[in-house]
């Protein structure tokens, strides 16, 4: 399946660009759905991660290795969590978070949000909202319920002393790039603290992209658990679940999680982000698209949703024809998740290209 009628075969990448099998170059504003955060073939990243391939790829979770120490040192420059569990994908990070919440609290109930997307494994899928992802796999994990996103009163009614955790995305990625409201996030934090429940911020898509390392930092709220994935390894499959409490050894685990290659990829990615100040600079690159069919532009930094009055499929295809690869987030939202190395000037070019395609449409 593809967004595009003509499915591209991508054969190589360099920086913010990719090339197809016919030699055509495209400005990549999808980045593997937010994964290639340093762009493609970043020379320093390729050098260091390539060297790791020649040194040590796996060691087994029962051993320590210097790459893990290097990664933890780099991570500590960004966040202040005491414990890190490493997996291989965003949905694994969410599964770990849900299990840890039940272990820590001794409770079963998980509260998630309408229109949320947390992954496709059974626990994460139970926290996900849309029926199209879930219906063929029911019954799912019991104990999950959903409340309306950004509804303070619904949160007050739902969160009780039977609640193990509340999980939310600071910016909902799959349902239209919808930011959480400040009052809502602070209410979630206050309520969970009051009843002894945990607050889980799913930052798999929003992490690193919004001008701060974690999007939840914009709200000046500290969650109990954070999940990270996608761009954290710049293409190497890896995810992190961050907590400030320990979990009994053996209660959860992964064969590949925390392997030397993944740890090196995270360490190098974080070091480049830090030295080039790419996370902070993302806040300067947000664009607001204008046009006759544009309702609004949502998001923060380089997590952008352009909301239109009509389905976006034809615009996505036209942009591809002009050499711009964009994604969707629902039927009426163009989603941009470009590499953080993209310049402000290039984002202005993207703005002009999208406006040109939208405003050039004279059909109803």
From Swiss-Prot:
CDD domains: OAT_like
Domain of life from the UniProt record: Archaea
Major localization class: cytoplasm
Subunit text: Homodimer.
GO molecular function, one term: pyridoxal phosphate binding
Residues reported in the UniProt entry to bind substrate: 120, 254
Entry-annotated residues carrying N6-(pyridoxal phosphate)lysine: 230
Cofactor: pyridoxal 5'-phosphate
Any single Gene Ontology cellular-component annotation: cytoplasm
Species whose genome carries this gene: Pyrococcus abyssi (strain GE5 / Orsay)
Class of enzymatic activity (EC top level): transferase
Protein known as: Putative [LysW]-aminoadipate semialdehyde/glutamate semialdehyde transaminase
């Amino acid at each position: 399946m593809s967004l595009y009628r003509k499915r591209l075969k991508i054969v190589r990448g360099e920086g913010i660009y990719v090339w197809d099998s016919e030699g055509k170059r495209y400005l990549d504003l999808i980045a593997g759905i937010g994964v290639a955060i340093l762009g493609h073939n970043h020379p320093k990243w390729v050098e260091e991660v390539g060297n790791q391939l020649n040194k040590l790829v796996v060691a087994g979770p029962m051993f320590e290795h210097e790459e893990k120490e290097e990664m933890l040192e780099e991570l500590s420059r960004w966040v202040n969590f005491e414990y890190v569990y490493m997996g291989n994908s965003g949905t694994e990070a969410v599964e770990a978070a849900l299990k840890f919440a039940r272990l820590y609290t001794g409770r079963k109930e998980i509260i998630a949000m309408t229109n949320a997307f947390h992954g496709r494994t059974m626990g994460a899928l139970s926290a996900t909202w849309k029926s199209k992802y879930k219906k063929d796999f029911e019954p799912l994990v019991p104990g999950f319920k959903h409340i309306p996103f950004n509804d303070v009163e619904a949160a007050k009614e739902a969160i009780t002393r039977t609640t193990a955790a509340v999980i939310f995305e600071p910016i909902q990625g799959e349902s239209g790039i919808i930011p959480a409201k400040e009052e809502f996030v602070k209410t979630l934090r206050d309520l969970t603290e009051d009843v002894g429940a945990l607050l889980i911020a799913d930052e798999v898509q929003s992490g690193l992209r919004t001008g701060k390392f974690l999007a939840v930092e914009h709200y000046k709220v500290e969650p109990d658990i954070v999940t990270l994935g996608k761009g954290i390894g710049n293409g190497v499959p890896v995810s992190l679940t961050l907590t400030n409490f320990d979990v009994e050894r053996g209660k959860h685990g992964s064969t590949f999680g925390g392997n030397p290659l993944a740890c090196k990829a995270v360490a190098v990615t974080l070091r480049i982000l830090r030295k080039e100040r790419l996370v902070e600079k993302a806040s300067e690159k947000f664009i607001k698209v204008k046009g006759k069919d544009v309702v609004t532009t949502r998001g923060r930094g380089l997590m952008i949703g352009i909301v239109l009055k009509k389905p976006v499929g034809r615009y996505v295809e036209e942009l591809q024809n002009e050499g711009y690869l964009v994604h969707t987030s629902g039927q009426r939202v163009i989603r941009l998740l470009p590499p953080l190395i993209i310049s402000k000037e290039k984002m202005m070019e993207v703005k002009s290209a999208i406006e040109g395609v939208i405003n050039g449409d004279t059909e109803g």
